[in-house]
Regions:
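Glycine-rich phosphate-binding loop of actin/hexokinase-like ATP-binding domains
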Residues: 30, 38-49, 279-280, 286-348, ...
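Short flexible coil/turn linkers enriched for glycine and charged/polar residues
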Residues: 22-25, 103-106, 297
Length: 592
């Protein structure tokens, strides 16, 4: 009883305010306790002011907070425009404030290591999981002369130099050789323009490295990214990298320091906070399946996958629906983008849209043509990012092992391009086309972009993420059944039966190869689903031809049957392909 009373008092005391600063939008979210559980009370969204002409995030933050104040009638800022903390007796302010940020320029980084395939590969994996832009990589196998390496370091205009190499207690001379190159290169740079140096190599050399750089250069020590040959540790080094990113952004964009003060010095990178939520979910869902998170932003595309708590996170800063959008033409191609369109458009019209969107990333589609273009681009951005992300997934789940996506539960998706569609069917079809899930999984939409805020708040307020994830703030699009197997189109591959728990009549039917269908089951409703696949067809019950049953939850669409095959094969004839894309939109209910 005493424990319940103390838990209740903690919940009653904690009003949580969260800010997420993106490159296009700044979001404010207010959470409070309702009937003993945390709930999302209000959100505010404003254009980000991190870029030109202001280069100061403060204005966007205050506009987003003003929206929350207007909706709730709750005062959050005092007369001096400062956050009121903790909550006053009149109910103004917040008890806990958390902040995340992805806005700001890319952090130009020089990576210096010993051997490719060991510490250098670990460091590259860490760079891929955050907002670093590798502009130069130098290692022992680099055949350039030392003078050229030094010149490249000096000319890189880097914000950060990351030095790795040597297991703990391992290589010494070769590490110091690289350290000397860095020291000479950095000393050629004017003092005010010198980058921060992060050393995350052989820890036994930490004091020697510090002595070599002395007080002349800005160096931070971090735990070794590869303490042993078969052991990788990126978690602790990420903290030092996060500080370097914050420092680099703070030099070019104002306002971050204020958010740090409000959050008690703990402004998180959006990617780190997002990964934390995906990792948490993997510990409470089916351990045999991966939790996949996809976020399509204006300046990046994130793919997070967690396998029983083993998080693999990739932030692709070359892929986004804003400024970097034209790069998709190099990473993929125009034909791959246009293959997803249900309408006939000239190539030049698609190119014009891509370049216009990169200049004006805040533009919202106002007509069908723009909507279809954005969703086609989103498909290709996700597919390209996923292909790259899977290179670092565990063996057996990576692209070298199988072209199939591993079994997933759930798939969490976010990004304005998905959240703002006129019907959830558009978002669902985009994800099915881009990810091609197999077996049985659930697709969940994060329409308010709450995941980073929940990740940031999981430290000071652990119950917040648990409660909000279980509330209606996340939208389940539905349960997906995607059979895998080879057979000709139109052939029966599956028999199914749905028995709703609420007393509605049971539904039975057959599924044929090539079908895409939706069986309505509303959010909050549950049913027992029985699947009996034909020989050679795998629906996720442990092998081809194996039948099974499970309890499923409803969603915005219901039960989605995607029997179009894996891999998804599109018609080579452009006209027939467009007709098929149009048909799929009708099949999934996006068009009515």
């Amino acid at each position: 009883v005493e424990r319940e009373r103390s838990m209740s008092s903690v919940l009653d005391a904690d009003t949580v305010l969260a800010i997420d600063v993106g490159s296009v939008s700044t979001r404010a979210s207010l959470f409070d306790v309702v009937d003993g559980r945390y709930r999302l009370i209000a959100t505010g969204r404003a254009p980000s002011t991190a870029g030109a002409p202001l280069f100061d995030i403060s204005e966007g933050v205050r506009m987003a907070l003003d929206q929350v104040q207007a909706v709730t009638g709750r005062q959050l800022l005092d007369e001096s425009e400062l956050l009121i903390m903790p909550v006053t007796s009149q109910g103004a302010g917040a008890d806990v404030f958390v902040a995340t940020a992805s806005a700001g320029p890319k952090v130009r980084t020089v990576l210096v290591g010993l051997m490719p395939g060991v510490s250098t590969t670990s460091a590259q994996r860490m760079a891929d999981s955050t907002y670093l832009e590798l502009v130069e990589v130098i290692n022992l196998l680099d055949r350039r002369r030392d003078e050229e390496k030094i010149s490249r370091i000096a000319a890189a205009r880097a914000d950060l130099i990351l030095v790795v190499g040597g297991t703990d207690g391992g290589a010494r001379d070769s590490v110091m050789q690289m350290i000397d190159l860095v020291a000479v290169g950095v000393e050629l740079i004017p003092a005010r323009q010198r980058p921060r140096i992060v050393y995350a190599g052989n820890r036994r050399l930490a004091s020697v490295v510090a002595e070599r750089f002395g007080n002349r250069l800005d160096i931070a020590q971090a735990p070794n990214v590869r303490p042993a040959l078969r052991h990788e540790d990126l978690v602790h080094a990420r903290l030092a990298i996060g500080e370097a990113i914050a420092e680099a952004r703070g030099k070019r964009v104002n306002g971050f320091q204020e958010l740090e003060q409000w959050s008690g010095g703990y402004l998180m990178l959006t990617a780190d906070a997002y990964g934390r939520v995906i990792k948490y979910l993997s510990r409470i869902y089916d351990p045999e399946k991966a939790v996949i998170g996809v976020d399509v932003g204006a300046s990046h595309t994130m793919v997070a996958a967690s396998f029983e708590g083993d998080l693999r996170l990739r932030v692709d800063t070359d892929l986004g629906l804003g400024k970097p959008l034209p790069i998709i033409l190099k990473r993929s191609n125009l034909e791959n983008i246009m293959r997803w369109l249900p309408l006939d458009l000239p190539k030049q019209a698609v190119l014009d849209y891509i370049h216009n969107k990169s200049i004006h990333p805040g533009l919202v589609p106002s007509e069908d043509t723009a909507l279809h273009l954005e969703l086609a681009l989103a498909r290709e951005l996700i597919r390209t990012a996923l292909k790259q992300a899977r290179t670092s997934w565990p063996r057996g789940k990576d692209l070298k092992s199988t072209w199939l996506l591993p079994p997933t539960e759930p798939i969490i998706a976010s990004g304005s391009v998905l959240a703002r569609t006129p019907h959830p069917g558009y978002a669902a079809l985009t994800l099915l086309d881009a990810l091609e899930p197999i077996g049985i999984s659930t697709m969940v939409l994060d329409p308010h972009g709450l995941s980073p805020s929940l990740g940031a708040a999981s430290g000071p307020v652990p119950m917040l993420a648990v409660h909000v994830l279980e509330s209606g703030s996340y939208i389940s699009l539905g349960t997906v059944v995607a059979p895998v197997g080879r057979t000709r189109p139109g052939r029966k591959i599956l028999t199914l039966q749905i028995e709703p728990e609420q007393g509605s009549e049971a539904i039975a039917g057959e599924v044929r190869m090539g079908q895409l269908a939706v069986i309505p089951l509303r959010q909050g409703e549950y049913a027992r689903l029985t699947l009996r696949p034909e020989r050679g067809i795998d629906v996720g019950f442990g092998g081809a031809g194996k039948a099974g049953a499970l309890r499923i939850a409803g969603g915005a669409l219901g039960l989605i049957i995607d029997a179009r095959g894996r891999p998804l094969k599109l018609d080579t004839d452009p006209a027939r392909r467009r007709d098929t894309n149009e048909k799929w939109l009708w099949d999934i209910g996006a068009k009515e």
